[in-house]
Amino acid sequence: LRIVIVTHVVRHNDGQGRVNYEIARAALAEDYEVTLVASHVAPELLANHRVRWVPVKVGRFWPSNLVRQQVFALKSAWWLRAHRGEYDVLHVNGFISWIRADVNTAHFVHGGWFKSPYYPFGLTKGLWSAYQYVYTRVNTALERWAYRRSRAITAVSQKVADEIRGLGIDGGKISVIYNGVDAGAFADAQPDRAAFALPADAFLLLFVGDLRTPRKNLGTVLKALTTLPENVHLAVAGYLPGSPYPDEARALGLGKRVHFLGLVRNMPTLMRSVDAYVFPSRYEAMSLSLLEAMAAGLPVVTARTAGGAEIITRECGIVLDDPDDPAALAQAIGTLAASRDACRAMGAAARDLMSRFGWAHMGAQYVALYRRIGQPSQPTAFGHVEHAVTQEQS
């Protein structure tokens, strides 16, 4: 089979990019030919002679992400239409190109985020808020257009699948394929608190996510921490410039108990160095970091508003009904902190659960879907990089 995957980046250190990276690897393992229509592709994939890269260059001079995404959508569609005879299965990700697709993977549903009671943006709340509101509304319309024109839709969680149905999309063509996780890398890492300057004797929580917006809900975690014993500390990993949370932590008197680490490259070691993972996100499609934490053997505290919470059992975590209830969050954390043995037992159950969510398992499901949709074609020879249509003019 000849597969085309359309996505902005294909690399192992990006959420959506990692998913497509592993899908490409799974397809190559079946001796399929893979064309990647993307702005960036990991060099190790390009070393494979069955990989062709169609680089879609989008200049940073375009005034906003909304415009840049349209440039990508138009350029990719031009190439795909011009080369329609060169592939059997077209796999896209949400709205990303002005073209009908065979497979469409939904990583995030803008319409679901807009309907969430925690959606914070509006036209009358300032220029940035107004832009975010317009961005969401435009993308809601675009994703509905894309899903209606896709033969098969794969959602990364049941929450995402339900939200796509809420857009009026035929549920018969929607299936759930959960993202994978490198279970071995996280389970086999060695703890090293000293490497992150973390206290050796504290009961240590971990929060990973975007620290510049309230959606991930670090604020509620900080409020909960104020009511917990002094030996309960919090490590926070995420991009710090522009974040209000360091000041908020100091204002709450938590300056010595909250450890802001910035961006962390060695996440397996960090996750193996803490006691539990806390992630009461107000809205999440499917969190890779949640899966990684469980693979590292951490019990998790999350909320029903976070996609992926549906897979968490009582044996391996605690799922809250309300992400904005600091008292309930504190009680859940306190339950874990009160018994290290029970905490470790829940972590072991989490690790066992993640053994069934490997990247290979995810990739095999996409390969099976490709087989059902595509028809074998005679292989064609091509080089690694296609420049004709998609290069930005200088």
PLM regions: where:
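A short, well-ordered alpha-helix in the C-terminal region of glycosyltransferases
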Residues: 335, 342-356, 365-368
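A short, active-site helix/loop in glycosyltransferases that binds the activated sugar's phosphate group
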Residues: 144-176, 181-185
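Short hydrophobic beta-strand element within catalytic cores of glycosyltransferases
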Residues: 299-302
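Aromatic "clamp/platform" in nucleotide-sugar-dependent glycosyltransferases that forms part
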Residues: 263, 282
